[in-house]
Amino acid sequence: MSRIGRMPIKIPPDVKITIEGNTVRVEGPKGRLEREIPANTKLVVENGRAVIEKAGEEKPGTAMLGLTRTLVANMVDGVTKGFQRNLELTGVGYRASLQGRKLVMTLGYSHPVEYEPPADIEIEVPAVTRIIIRGADKEKVGRVAAKIRSFRSPEPYKGKGVRYEGEKIRLKAGKAGLKKR
């Protein structure tokens, strides 16, 4: 049995978990999340703790325990604390701003790049070269951050582009130049 799958999930008092068939709904101060869990696992909520158990003795049920436990734990964390990803813009003239909910970025193209985030994702631009993405769903926050990063991924010669905060870009040496004769 999975070590992670065996660990119980602590449920804060302001979080409510409801189970209908294979659908798990988690409600808390930061929002409401819903997810389908695999049919060969079941969620048992008791005494402020949630435990993932196998529904049968098949091997796929055992294989999904750790994943299911982590997904439910992320849902609980998301509705209580929320998740955040930070992006940095590196390059001359690279900047970001918000126009309403729309993120507008100048990334060295001939046109500004605009991105409208999903309804439950919040984007903040505290500085022109910094973007903060917040939300309750960890998967969606990561997907939005990856989408914004994909507009101009860091290039390997000068490191210009949109990168995650703290991301290290391995720079290439570039051309060695012509040998002097």
Swiss-Prot record:
Chain segments annotated as coiled-coil in the UniProt record: none
Keyword Ribonucleoprotein attributed: yes
GO terms of biological process kind: cytoplasmic translation
InterPro entries: Ribosomal_uL6-like, Ribosomal_uL6-like_a/b-dom_sf, Ribosomal_uL6_a/b-dom, Ribosomal_uL6_bac-type, Ribosomal_uL6_CS
GO molecular function: rRNA binding; structural constituent of ribosome
Quaternary structure and interacting proteins, as annotated: Part of the 50S ribosomal subunit.
NCBIfam families according to UniProt: L6_bact
Function noted in UniProt: This protein binds to the 23S rRNA, and is important in its secondary structure. It is located near the subunit interface in the base of the L7/L12 stalk, and near the tRNA binding site of the peptidyltransferase center.
Protein name: Large ribosomal subunit protein uL6
The species this protein was found in: Desulforudis audaxviator (strain MP104C)
